[in-house]
C-alpha cells in the first residue's frame, strides 16, 4: 500500500513538471507519514500541506520538490534550511547533499525533528534552535539557502551568507505570497518570481 501511494505521488510530481530524478527518489524513499500526526497518516501521500502542531505545517510534496529543484544542488553543496519544522524537507535535502544545516525557532519542533531524523538513520544534519532571519553565519557561506516560511521582506543576513552564485529560495509576502529564487553574483542579487504560494509566516527574533 505504501509503495502504491508513494508511486502515485511520484507520478503526480512528474506531471507537475518535477524532473530531477534524485529529488523524486528521495521523496519516494522517505516515509512522509512519520513526519505528521498519526491521525493524519491517511493523507501522507496526498499533495496537501498538513498541520504538525505549534501553528506550523508540513509543506505539500510538490512545493518541497519544486523548492529543492530550484536550489540546483550538487552533493557537495553547503546548504542552510531556515525552518526545520517536521524535518521532512530537511530529510529530502539530506538525501541529496553531504551535510545539511537547519534552524528552527520552536524548540519542541527542533527536538522532535532531530529525534526523528536519527530514527530514520539520517545523521548528516546539524540542527539549531535559533532565529532564522539571522541565518547561521558560522556555518556559511552557503551554496543554497531554503526558507520554509514566508518572510515579509528578504532578510539581508541570508543574502550576505550566500556564496557567489549561491541560490536563495524563499516565499515572500503576507496575504499574497510569491516564491522567489535569488541568485548572488558578486555583490549583486538577481531575483525571479517562480509562482504564487501560501506559507506560514517567518517570525523574526522570537524563539519558542
From Swiss-Prot:
Keyword Transferase: yes
Repeat is among the record's keywords: no
Coiled-coil regions, chain positions: none
GO BP terms: methylation; protein modification process; protein repair
Annotated EC: 2.1.1.77
Similarity comment: Belongs to the methyltransferase superfamily. L-isoaspartyl/D-aspartyl protein methyltransferase family.
Subcellular location: Cytoplasm
Entry annotation: catalytic residues: 59
UniProt GO MF annotations: protein-L-isoaspartate (D-aspartate) O-methyltransferase activity
Any GO CC annotation of this UniProt entry: cytoplasm
Function: Catalyzes the methyl esterification of L-isoaspartyl residues in peptides and proteins that result from spontaneous decomposition of normal L-aspartyl and L-asparaginyl residues. It plays a role in the repair and/or degradation of damaged proteins.
EC primary class: transferase
Domain of life: Bacteria
Pfam families assigned: PCMT
Protein name: Protein-L-isoaspartate O-methyltransferase
InterPro entries xrefs: PCMT, SAM-dependent_MTases_sf
Catalytic activity field: [protein]-L-isoaspartate + S-adenosyl-L-methionine = [protein]-L-isoaspartate alpha-methyl ester + S-adenosyl-L-homocysteine
Originating organism: Aliivibrio fischeri (strain MJ11) (Vibrio fischeri)
Keywords for this protein: Cytoplasm, Methyltransferase, S-adenosyl-L-methionine, Transferase
Amino acid at each position: 500500500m505504501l509503495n502504491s501511494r508513494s508511486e502515485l505521488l511520484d507520478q503526480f510530481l512528474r506531471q507537475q513538471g518535477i524532473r530531477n530524478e534524485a529529488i523524486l527518489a528521495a521523496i519516494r524513499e522517505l516515509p512522509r507519514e512519520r513526519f505528521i500526526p498519526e491521525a493524519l497518516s491517511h493523507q501522507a501521500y496526498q499533495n496537501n500541506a498538513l498541520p504538525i502542531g505549534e501553528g506550523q505545517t508540513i509543506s505539500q510534496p510538490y512545493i518541497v520538490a519544486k523548492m529543492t529543484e530550484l536550489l540546483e544542488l550538487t552533493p557537495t553543496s553547503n546548504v542552510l534550511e531556515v525552518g526545520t519544522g517536521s524535518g521532512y524537507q530537511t530529510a529530502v535535502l539530506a538525501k541529496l547533499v553531504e551535510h545539511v544545516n537547519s534552524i528552527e525557532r520552536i524548540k519542541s519542533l527542533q527536538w522532535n525533528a532531530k529525534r526523528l531524523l536519527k530514527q530514520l538513520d539520517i545523521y548528516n544534519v546539524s540542527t539549531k534552535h535559533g532565529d532564522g532571519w539571522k541565518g547561521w553565519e558560522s556555518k556559511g557561506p552557503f551554496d543554497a539557502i531554503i526558507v520554509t516560511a514566508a518572510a515579509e521582506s528578504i532578510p539581508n543576513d541570508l543574502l550576505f551568507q550566500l556564496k557567489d552564485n549561491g541560490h536563495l529560495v524563499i516565499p515572500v509576502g503576507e496575504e499574497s505570497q510569491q516564491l522567489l529564487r535569488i541568485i548572488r553574483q558578486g555583490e549583486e542579487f538577481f531575483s525571479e518570481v517562480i509562482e504564487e504560494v501560501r506559507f506560514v509566516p517567518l517570525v523574526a527574533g522570537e524563539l519558542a
